[in-house]
């Protein structure tokens, strides 16, 4: 996994007396993240004095309106009553990991073998268009749409 690779690289650099206080992992499947996103996430880490920062974006569909269906497709218990008659704007905002930016204190990463230092991790909120994670052809088409939009 990525953490094992990062630790291996840090170990190899240590043999050459090269040390880094922080690492940043930029996934290649998130090509629309920009320099401004990266710089702002670093600023957040320094401001919060935290051990890790992970990028997120708002979900398009609120999970309070999502459920599984029984074999008979009945919707009797599909949505809990408190949320049934609310507009989406009145529901709490939910966020998801977007895979674009992971910042972490190198020592804490090595000690905890994770990019998520739970008691000292903060979210860097990115907009949807910078959060496209290319895992499918549809994602690639969406990324190309935004690239064309930015370049016009």
Regions found by a protein language model. Give the residues of each.
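Hydrophobic helical membrane-anchoring modules
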Residues: 124-125, 129-152
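Conserved core of the sugar-phosphate nucleotidyltransferase
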Residues: 1-8, 22, 31-120, 125
